[in-house]
């Protein structure tokens, strides 16, 4: 039996309403393609393209993810994978997919990436092998970006297997949340109440 899993990775530092909207969109987007068995959230440990200086411990990030996804209609489909957190050194998508394939040998993976990541995708470690291990779908948050993405894929024939998903944008970022907390400002409009309470209770992001 083939198991269909969608993979959504990120720092989630912290998880916010934009992430939740996107998770719901990803779940709904897979329904016409036969649905999915699991939606794997993969928190990163030490992403190769970012500084880990302001990354809080994984235990806090995972706890906030669990609190945040409880209210989603697809909550029963969501699974948090610690596979990258358990690896040493930099986290690469290729190695993560190889490990996931070992865990789920019958798995068929759909990897979601941002449109900004797509334009740098050919710089990713073993990107061509990533395309062999998973169906890659690039998320564009604005309809106007779709043509730019389509043109990019047309010019780059080696990325022909990548498809595009348009998702309604929710303007919020983890950086914005961390800055607000550090300045003593409210974040109730950016994250679920349970996450805001957790951040306050644990004294996170206060600088």
Name what the model sees in each region:
Residues 4-207:
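Nucleotidyltransferase catalytic core that binds NTPs
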């Amino acid at each position: 039996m083939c198991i269909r899993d969608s993979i959504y990775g990120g720092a989630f530092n912290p998880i916010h309403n934009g992430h939740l909207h996107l998770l719901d969109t990803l779940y709904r987007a897979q329904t016409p393609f036969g649905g999915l068995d699991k939606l794997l959230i993969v928190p990163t440990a030490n992403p190769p393209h970012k500084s880990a200086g302001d990354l809080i411990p994984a235990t806090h990030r995972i706890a906030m993810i669990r609190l945040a996804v409880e209210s989603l209609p697809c909550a029963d489909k969501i699974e948090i994978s610690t596979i990258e957190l358990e690896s040493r050194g930099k986290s690469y998508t290729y190695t993560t997919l190889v490990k996931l394939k070992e865990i789920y040998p019958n798995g068929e993976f759909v990897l979601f990436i941002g449109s900004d990541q797509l334009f740098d995708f050919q710089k990713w470690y073993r990107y061509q092998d990533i395309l062999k291990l998973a169906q890659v779908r690039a998320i564009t948050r604005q309809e106007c970006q779709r043509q730019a993405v389509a043109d990019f894929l047309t010019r780059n024939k080696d990325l022909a297997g990548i498809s595009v998903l348009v998702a309604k944008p929710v303007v919020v970022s983890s950086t914005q949340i961390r800055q607000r907390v550090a300045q003593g400002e409210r974040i109730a409009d950016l994250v679920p109440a349970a996450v805001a309470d957790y951040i306050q209770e644990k004294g996170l992001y206060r600088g």
